């Protein structure tokens, strides 16, 4: 009878320890990660473009920033790029900047993509995916609309039409009431 009781107590203690360990791991992986949402400060980052020029998000304060995460293999991303290029021609002079963050690909692959799509805006490389993780991005494409004060005013997941891109750039241009 004593052996059964000891076994029962040991099993109970083991279950409590396993639950505590599981809870600790869950908190470390998921609960500690703050999701970037509307109204949040946009996390600063420094990344290089395909020519090695450093771009820091905080240097763009005072401008609206259309922060787009993408990949060369992503079909919806390919669809958006010509629309983004068209709208950039119009909105750049109004204080809106596009920063397209390529996720985990080589300089050569990104450079070739840029040439074939006639990209006219800054494209930076997040080879180690640190910025992707900081912004908690999933899936691609995901776009963060950042107002001139550095606040995220909208997060858009999935493909955008040219009309949507136009409206979003209007939303974040300096002088507009964007959150």
Swiss-Prot record:
Ranges that cross the membrane: 11-30
Transmembrane helix as UniProt keyword: yes
Pathways per UniProt: Protein modification; cytochrome c assembly
Membrane topology: Single-pass type II membrane protein
SUPFAM superfamilies tied to this protein: Thioredoxin-like
Gene Ontology annotations for the cellular component aspect, listed alphabetically: plasma membrane
Highest taxon above the source species: Bacteria
Any Pfam family: AhpC-TSA
Keywords: Cell membrane, Cytochrome c-type biogenesis, Disulfide bond, Membrane, Oxidoreductase, Redox-active center, Signal-anchor, Transmembrane, Transmembrane helix
Disulfide linkage: 74-77
Family: Belongs to the thioredoxin family. ResA subfamily.
Function as written in the Swiss-Prot or TrEMBL entry: Thiol-disulfide oxidoreductase which is required in disulfide reduction during c-type cytochrome synthesis. May accept reducing equivalents from CcdA, leading to breakage of disulfide bonds in apocytochrome c; following this reduction heme can be covalently attached. Does not play a role in sporulation.
Name this polypeptide is given: Thiol-disulfide oxidoreductase ResA
Origin species: Bacillus subtilis (strain 168)
Gene name of the encoded protein: resA
